[in-house]
């Protein structure tokens, strides 16, 4: 991707210059972003527009600019990014540029460089010899790192709604609501997930991360998440001590929080089942050891072990135990989450506000993000904290997951029938 700015001055609206410029850019396979637009108030007042022209590479952009010059476009000089060295470890220069989660480019030595490892609330560090830049968190800053300060030479490209709509993420571009048609939405999510899984199987790239809360187990939908993992629709699992603990409790005792998952009734002594489950895993050594010893024979964590799916169980101050697999150092947990999120195509957040917001803070805005919760305020909080690309589905996760599995099974059966007809 390559970009250049153009400027238009004069009666660019009355003379239809502005729409002609937009049409020409799109007709030549480029894209654009309006950076500034000032409309003249009176008939004699000129208008002004600054537009970012985006193309596949430098040659493509030059071809577009050559055509736009004929329409009156001016090519201004672009300011270079400003850099200052970090004075010591974990200390940023005054006035450092604080990143968003949107795709970002910097102008350095006459070239636009795409910033790597994009996330919100970080700083941009530039490596002149390698002609590259990346986002680093404040705790990873080292003395001497060249940090971007101010806004000069920085371009942010927010995700935009495609001009040709129709997909899931256009259909759902509105506030979270319990009144949206659940079956239609779940069907579209299943189609997206199926396509992502097929791409992952063919290329090893992309994939889906599930962020799960204990409500998955409490509502009796643990089997559905386990099946998603077994079917290949989960490439990483993020959760806390609670989901894993209650998943193991449900396997060993048939309860979650002491409530029988078949009858919905509390069982005698059930209040201690989660502690006994933790104790069993402690005795075994780890969740993996419990699977290998035949103690755990099914469930979400069992499927993660059997299918080599990496998971991050991030600790909390309120945890019982916790399980030996839980990462109690939040910095280490966050680093592992960030590593597993790299290159993923979708994140499915299921009934966990804490872990959903934590994951959202690590995500670039172009990753498809779906948040399922019975409380609409959870989606609102997620978006308020910067994850504006999140699409909210207000429903019980215990209903959502089984329906999702059902839709995915239908898609797989349709594929099998199609392949047999071709034979």
Swiss-Prot record:
Family classification: Belongs to the AgrE/ArgZ ornithine cyclodeaminase family.
Transmembrane parts of this sequence: none
Catalytic reaction list: L-ornithine = L-proline + NH4(+)
Keywords associated with the record: Lyase, NAD, Nucleotide-binding
Keyword Nucleotidyltransferase carried by entry: no
Annotated NCBIfam families: TIGR00300 family protein
Cofactor: NAD(+)
EC number from the UniProt entry: 4.3.1.12
Role played: Catalyzes the conversion of ornithine to proline, with the release of ammonia.
Enzyme class: lyase
Residues annotated to bind NAD(+): 241-242, 320, 352-355, 373, 396-397
Descriptive protein name: Ornithine cyclodeaminase
The keyword NAD is assigned to this record: yes
Residues spanning the signal sequence: none
Pfam families per record: ArgZ-like_C_1st, ArgZ-like_C_2nd, Saccharop_dh_N
């Amino acid at each position: 991707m390559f970009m250049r700015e153009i400027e238009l001055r004069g009666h660019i609206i009355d003379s239809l210059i502005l729409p002609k410029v937009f049409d020409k850019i799109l007709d030549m396979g480029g894209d654009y972003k309006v950076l500034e637009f000032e409309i003249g108030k009176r008939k004699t007042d000129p208008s002004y527009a600054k537009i970012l022209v985006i193309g596949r590479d430098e040659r493509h952009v030059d071809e577009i600019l050559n055509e736009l010059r004929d329409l009156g476009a001016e090519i201004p000089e672009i300011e270079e990014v400003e850099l200052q060295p970090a004075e010591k470890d974990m200390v940023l220069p005054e006035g450092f540029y604080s990143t968003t989660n949107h795709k970002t480019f910097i102008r350095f030595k006459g070239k636009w460089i795409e910033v790597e490892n994009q996330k919100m609330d970080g700083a941009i560090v530039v490596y002149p010899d390698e002609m590259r830049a990346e986002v680093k968190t404040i705790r990873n800053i080292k003395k001497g790192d060249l940090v971007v300060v101010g806004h000069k030479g920085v371009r942010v490209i927010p995700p935009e709604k495609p001009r040709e709509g129709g997909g899931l993420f256009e259909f759902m571009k509105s506030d979270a609501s319990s009144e949206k048609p659940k079956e239609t939405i779940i069907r579209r999510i299943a189609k997206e997930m199926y396509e992502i899984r097929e791409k992952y199987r063919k290329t090893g790239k992309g994939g889906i991360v599930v962020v799960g809360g204990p409500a998955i187990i409490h509502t009796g939908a643990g089997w559905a998440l386990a099946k998603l993992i077994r079917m290949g629709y989960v490439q990483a699992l993020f959760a806390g001590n609670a989901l894993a603990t209650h998943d193991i409790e449900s396997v060993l005792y048939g309860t979650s929080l002491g409530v029988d998952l078949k009858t919905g009734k509390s069982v005698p002594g059930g209040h201690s089942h989660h502690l006994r489950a933790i104790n069993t895993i402690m005795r075994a050594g780890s969740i993996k050891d419990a699977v290998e010893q035949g103690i755990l024979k099914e469930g979400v964590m069992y499927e993660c072990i059997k299918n080599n799916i990496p998971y991050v169980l991030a600790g909390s101050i309120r945890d019982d135990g916790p399980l030996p697999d839980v990462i109690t150092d939040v910095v280490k947990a966050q680093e592992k989450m960030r590593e597993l999120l790299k290159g993923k195509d979708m994140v499915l957040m299921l009934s966990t506000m804490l872990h959903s917001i934590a994951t959202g803070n690590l995500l670039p805005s172009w990753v498809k993000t779906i948040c399922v919760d019975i409380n609409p305020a959870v989606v609102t909080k997620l978006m308020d904290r910067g994850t504006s690309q999140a699409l909210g589905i207000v429903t019980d996760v215990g209903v959502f997951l089984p329906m999702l599995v059902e839709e995915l099974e239908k898609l797989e059966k349709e594929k099998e029938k199609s392949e047999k007809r071709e034979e």
